[in-house]
From Swiss-Prot:
Lineage: Eukaryota, Viridiplantae, Streptophyta, Embryophyta, Tracheophyta
Prodomain positions: 181-183
UniProt source species: Oryza sativa subsp. japonica (Rice)
Pfam families noted in UniProt: EF-hand_7
Name of the protein in its database record: Calmodulin-like protein 3
Location (main, coarse): membrane
Length: 183
C-alpha cells in the first residue's frame, strides 16, 4: 500500500470501522457496497461480487482491512486510468462530437504508423460498438479499454495492449507511459 497516503489510509480505516459492526476487523460483502458509497464510489452488485472474489481468498464473504486497502488502491488506479482513457478518447475523436467514427479510427491508426486494413477496422468497431450504431461512444470506448487494461494487468503485461482478436501487438498509443491500449 506504498502508493496510498497516510491520510487516505486513515480515511479508509475510518470508513471501514463505521461498517465493521461487531468490531472484529472484517466487513461483509453487503457492507462493502455501503463503504464504497461513503467514499464516493457506486459499484453495481456484480462489481461488488467481483471485488469481493478478488480479495476474499477464503470465500467467507468478509473482507479484512488489509484486503480492503488493496481493493481501494486498485479502484483508485482505475480512476486514474479513466482519466488517461478520456484523454485517449479525445485523441481518437477528432471532431470532438463524442463519437469515434470509422474514418477517425482509421486516421489515428495511420498516424501511429500502423494503417488498418478494412477487416481490422471492422473487427475493432465490432468489438467496441456495443449499440451497433457504427461508431464508438465514450462509454463503449471506456468499457473496452478498462477490460483490456485489467486483462493486461492480470497477464502481467503492464500498460501494453493488443488489438482485437487478431493478436497484432501495439502499445502506448497515446504516449510512451500511457495506460492507453489499442482497441
Amino acid at each position: 500500500m506504498d502508493h496510498l497516503t497516510k491520510e487516505q489510509i486513515a480515511e479508509f480505516r475510518e470508513a471501514f470501522n463505521l461498517f465493521d459492526k461487531d468490531g472484529d476487523g472484517t466487513i461483509t460483502s453487503k457492507e462493502l457496497g455501503t463503504v464504497m458509497g461513503s467514499l464516493g464510489q457506486s459499484p453495481t452488485e456484480a462489481e461488488l461480487k467481483k471485488m469481493v472474489e478478488e480479495v476474499d481468498a477464503d470465500g467467507s464473504g468478509s473482507i479484512e482491512f488489509e484486503e480492503f486497502l488493496g481493493l481501494l488502491a486498485r479502484k483508485l488506479r482505475d480512476t486514474g486510468a479513466e482519466d488517461d482513457i478520456r484523454d485517449a478518447f479525445r485523441v481518437f475523436d477528432k471532431d470532438q462530437n463524442g463519437f469515434i467514427t470509422p474514418d477517425e479510427l482509421r486516421h489515428v491508426m495511420a498516424n501511429l504508423s500502423d494503417p488498418l486494413s478494412d477487416d481490422e477496422l471492422a473487427d475493432m468497431l465490432h468489438e467496441a460498438d456495443s449499440d451497433g450504431d457504427g461508431q464508438i461512444n465514450y462509454n463503449e470506448f471506456l468499457k473496452v479499454m478498462m477490460a483490456k487494461r485489467r486483462q493486461n494487468m492480470m497477464e502481467g503485461h503492464g500498460s501494453g495492449g493488443h488489438r482485437s482478436s487478431n493478436s497484432h501487438k501495439k502499445s502506448g498509443c497515446c504516449g510512451p507511459n500511457s495506460s492507453c491500449t489499442i482497441l
